[in-house]
């Protein structure tokens, strides 16, 4: 199995969180004022994404940057709900 590079992991995390909200790529991109084409390329790992855009995406998904990156995709364990509620950056 091929190891996922950083852009692929970021894209998978976006797709995972967006899917959990039941939002299409198009409606989510519109809600954060981002091009659907750009978002699609980020989600498949074809585009590097700036930290500013990761922050914008995370806010649109209703999570903090800490929650966004606190995933097994990035080598961490997911926060428990009580930890997430009290987590501060």
Regions inferred by a protein language model and the residue ranges of each:
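A short, Lys/Arg-rich alpha-helix, primarily the initiator
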Residues: 1-20
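DNA-binding alpha-helical recognition surfaces that contact promoter or target DNA
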Residues: 12, 16, 30, 41, ...
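Residue-level signal for the short linker/turn that defines the boundary of a DNA-recognition helix
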Residues: 12, 22-23, 49-52
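Residues within the helices of the helix-turn-helix
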Residues: 15, 26, 55
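Alpha-helical residues within the helix-turn-helix
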Residues: 19, 30, 59
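Short alpha-helical DNA-recognition segment
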Residues: 22-44
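DNA major-groove recognition helix of helix-turn-helix/homeodomain DNA-binding modules
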Residues: 33, 52-67
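Short, charged recognition helix plus adjacent turn
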Residues: 59, 69-89
